[in-house]
């Protein structure tokens, strides 16, 4: 409405839909997820809420959000990171791809160890992925 008033419009054309309370809540959640300023962890949490609260499967959520099912699966995987890991990732402005690279590691301790190196050395995504792969390779050699 504010934009219409700023443009000097006296009336705003619109379409009114009569929808259920459940569908209204789903639409509101979908709109929030699609906002540009939502962090990738917030987006993942909202998708998880959409799926669990409304009894959806990933394909349903993907359809509602206009995303591929694989994108939804990747977003949900981010929630495997601990709150401490998420805080470091967000606090040091690391990307979703940094976070996904860390998910290849088996334990929180390993992820924190690598995460500290990423932060200390200001590694980009490519170098982070290489560090993770090298760590996994060295671990296999030791076993």
How does the language model describe each region?
Residues 35-38, 42-143:
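Amphipathic alpha-helical extensions and coiled-coil-like segments
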Residues 1-40, 88:
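A short, basic-hydrophobic beta/loop patch
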């Amino acid at each position: 409405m504010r934009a219409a008033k700023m443009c000097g419009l006296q009336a705003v054309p619109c379409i009114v839909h009569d929808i259920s309370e459940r569908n209204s809540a789903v639409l509101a959640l979908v709109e929030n997820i699609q906002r540009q300023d939502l962090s990738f962890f917030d987006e993942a949490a909202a998708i998880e809420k959409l799926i669990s609260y409304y009894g959806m499967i990933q394909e349903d959520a993907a359809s509602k959000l206009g995303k591929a099912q694989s994108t939804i699966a990747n977003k949900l995987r981010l929630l495997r990171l601990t709150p401490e890991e998420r805080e470091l990732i967000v606090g040091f402005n690391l990307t979703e791809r940094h976070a996904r690279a860390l998910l290849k590691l088996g334990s929180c301790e390993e992820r924190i160890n690598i995460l500290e190196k990423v932060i200390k050395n200001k590694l980009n995504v490519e170098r982070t992925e290489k560090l993770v792969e090298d760590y996994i390779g060295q671990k296999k050699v030791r076993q």
